[in-house]
Amino acid sequence: MSVPAIAVYTSPPGAVYTSSSSSELEASSRGSAPCATAAPPSPASSHRHQAIAGGLSCLFSSPTAAPRAAAAQDELGALWHDRSGEATAVGGGGGGGGYSYPQPSSPFKWRDMLHHSPVPLFHSPASSPASRSPSASWLAGRERERLFSSFVRNALGSCVDYAPVAALPLGVSAAVGVGAGELAFELDEHLSEAEPSCEPYARDLLAGAQARHRIFHDELVVKAFFEAERAHRGQTRASGDPYLQHCVETAVLLAKIGANATVVSAGLLHDTIDDSFMDYDQIFRMFGAGVADLVEGVSKLSHLSKLARDNNTASRTVEADRLHTMFLAMADARAVLIKLADRLHNMKTIEALPLVKQQRFAKETMEIFVPLANRLGIASWKDQLENICFKHLNPEEHKELSSKLVISFDEALLTSTLDKLDKGLRDEGISYHSLSGRHKSLYSIYSKMIKKNLTMDDVHDIHGLRLVVDTEQDCYQALDIVHKLWPRVAGRFKDYILHPKLNGYRSLHTVIMCEGIHPFEVQIRTKEMHLQAEYGFAAHWRYKEGGCKHSFVLQMVEWARWVLTWQCEAMSKERSSGLGRSDAIRPPCPFPSHSEDCPYSYTRQCNHDGPIFVIMLEHDKMSVQELPANSTVVDLMERVGANSPRCSPYSFPLKEELRPRVNHKPISDPNRKLCMGDVVELTPALPHKSLTEYREEIQRMYERGGFALATTRDGPAS
């Protein structure tokens, strides 16, 4: 049975609450031990120690303590941690898997509540004589449960009322006046340390992640790590690795693109709803709505992904296009990023799966997740996903092209080209952030060769240089220098600064001839453009919002508008031009900007004429249905009935036989409006009889021979 621990600090409140800055208070709220390491009180505050009341102490304090309790409530809320479910792990070292923040010396101590009234405890000074030790059986048994269930159950925390402390001389620590180890009770020795219970390999994983990125030292992320370890304990992947390792690698990918603690924590927990005992409510209680909503969003995307894979939706171009558009429109884009990170690590370890599954996952990734990464603008993830899929879908071509790429690479030529450009920039007084060599991704080369019917020698941008400068003006000045140093290939200059790509990519591209025979592509961009190119929608995480053209919230709104706008315009152009693919159709406004008078502008708060897409499950088969705006369940049912040649034995249309469920829940109002991304299940409805009566009737028909007659009359079952 889960029992929350009651905890108190071993130092007087002055050592904890008299901090002179908000940063010190924040440090205290993150779980640092306030006892021996507390700074000496300032002269202004050392003589004003007051009793701090809160939590359960409000039940027992004098009337004068009530105002103090209310005033201290906000401060105390950050200092007390919910430790429900920990008693087994802390008390007996069992496999309960409880969590607490890892600390060198925990400030939490256990009270002897069984043998002493809480009233004198809450009012006694910190230096009062120690009371008798708890019995060995105190932490187990019905007495403990009865005690806690009577008045402590679900308590958020508790505190001690301290008696005023006399002023201390300047420079003398409060710990001198009050014994740091003296409590109103003695401490069970084995309870003094409240360390998380987890496997040794898990601690190694956490240490490794912390060495790779500092965000894994964050309190929220550490808490998410231990909860993920508890949720996935004992689970392994097909490769034999612990499941927790996949969670950590997913979170590391997110950390590398600059994700904050909320997103990284959700990355650690992204599979808990689908693959463990945890549900949304538990995550919400432990981490709040921010993390819980993201984990739930990833779970929904995973569900749709599985449906698409099982029904081979990726092979149907129209439905695949609708599906990944729906992914972007229906979910927080951060949930899509987490799902992409999850898929990227899965693809990196795909060798552990059987060959058939490798092919299926690679095909789905290429058709669904690569376009997602492209539209979000995360070039590095897109390239990695494409190359892995290319290796498994076209192994022979991949091997041949890899060999040719290695042969064509000339390191000496690249080095001399870099040196020449560096000297030219310095001579003209152009500073830059970075200058490096690059090469086109393997799949991009292959795709270009197939699309334009070229040989590898005809692809001019396989190798190149990338220059990152300070300002947009520097981009064009550097371009002039490049064209003075080398002859350029006619028709190969592209100005993506004036004409950005659909996903927001901006840069200058030109192709030059080195030593007269070797084509090199040169990319020139600013630092902000480089972040946008590498991290796309996540680029705002890489620099302060104050330096952005669009704030984070505005970008989220514009993202949702752009996705729906793009789809509305693309489908309109598709109908008029007969194009089979809509990727090449340009939206009316470039992302993330949007003109106010655009006829296709969309927000979730206003009416719009754009279509919605819903997942329809009928007889375990999935399809992605396009419906007009404001469509209802009845509209979908009528479409199903109209498109089906079958009728029921009672001559009702097929839709009358079906009982719809929306997002796995029965609906009472068939006129309910459908939303983007809804999952509608159409299941046959049994007659209004009990199942027993239904079986008995079938048995009687069989015994009378009527079953054969009915079968002959109605024809064989389809």
Curated annotation (Swiss-Prot):
Residues 9-48 are annotated as: Disordered. Belongs to the RelA/SpoT family. PANTHER family: GTP DIPHOSPHOKINASE RSH2, CHLOROPLASTIC-RELATED, GUANOSINE-3',5'-BIS DIPHOSPHATE 3'-PYROPHOSPHOHYDROLASE. Residues 19-39 have a biased composition (Low complexity). This is Probable GTP diphosphokinase RSH2, chloroplastic. The gene is RSH2. Keywords: ATP-binding, Chloroplast, GTP-binding, Kinase, Nucleotide-binding, Plastid, Stress response, Transferase, Transit peptide. InterPro entries: HD/PDEase_dom (IPR003607), HD_domain (IPR006674), NT_sf (IPR043519), RelA_SpoT (IPR007685). One of its GO terms (cellular component) is chloroplast. Its EC number is 2.7.6.5. It catalyses: GTP + ATP = guanosine 3'-diphosphate 5'-triphosphate + AMP. Its main location: plastid. Residues 243-347 form the HD domain. SMART domains: HDc, RelA_SpoT. Residues 1-68 form a transit peptide.
